[in-house]
Amino acid sequence: MKKIFIECCIESYIEAINAEKKGADQLELCSDLNNDGLTPNFDVVKKVIRNISMPIKIMIRPRGGDFNYSGENMVEIKKQITYVKTIGINHIVFGVMNKDHRVDIDNIKRVSDWSFPMKITFHKAIDASAEFFTDIEALVNTKRIDSLLTSGKSTTAESGASIIKKVISFYGKNIKVISAGKITKSNLNNIHRKISGSYYHGRKILGKLC
């Protein structure tokens, strides 16, 4: 079985420490994962980056609910991006959709301008797209998105495996496709056999962290 890249989704400093000890390749730091993740507390961010040597992504999401952001929301998003850039973060996770459940390319370009030269991973919000493959292609064509989190339009990576495999086949040379959605230490190998991807993401992908 080929080497796979493990991205561990965490909420706290102790989870970051334990994920590093267990061999994670990268961390995604969020808050409120029960709500699909929000922007983490910046004191936690600073503590993690002071003490962890591996690559770290930061979620940028100012509120729960949908991903159709108001002008006021976008102002807050810009503030959050500006701040995490100043403290040394070089990769963010972000998603934005319009009222028609399509990727909001205009706001993606704004966020890319604000965050440059940071990398961007597009959030699993892509799974709610009314035109899933068309919107992934639009993201790829911006040449501003490094990677994409997806459950293949399903609730779990396992049930969406066939769609994820198609995404990798169509776009994997242009964007990192990160399989996500209830991936755990116990089901990772089975999911990998179905998808044959390179990148996997989960809160319990390395088992319990605290």
What does each model-identified segment do?
Residues 99-103, 107-111, 121, 127, ...:
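Active-site pocket-lining/capping segments in soluble small-molecule metabolic enzymes
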Residues 9-13, 32, 59-65, 97-99, ...:
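Active-site beta-loop-alpha junctions enriched in small/polar residues
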Residues 25-38, 83, 87-99, 143-158, ...:
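Glycine-rich phosphate-binding active-site loops on the catalytic face of alpha/beta enzymes
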Residues 117-156:
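Histidine/lysine/aspartate-rich catalytic loop segments that bind and position anionic ligands
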Residues 5-18, 22-38:
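N-terminal beta1-alpha1 ligand-phosphate binding loop
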Residues 11-22, 58, 68-83, 106-108, ...:
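Catalytic cores of alpha/beta
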Residues 41-106, 207-209:
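Glycine/small-residue-rich loop that forms an oxyanion/phosphate-binding "nest" at active or ligand-binding sites
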Residues 2-6, 23-25, 52-56, 88-90, ...:
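Short, well-ordered coil/turn segments that N-cap beta-strands
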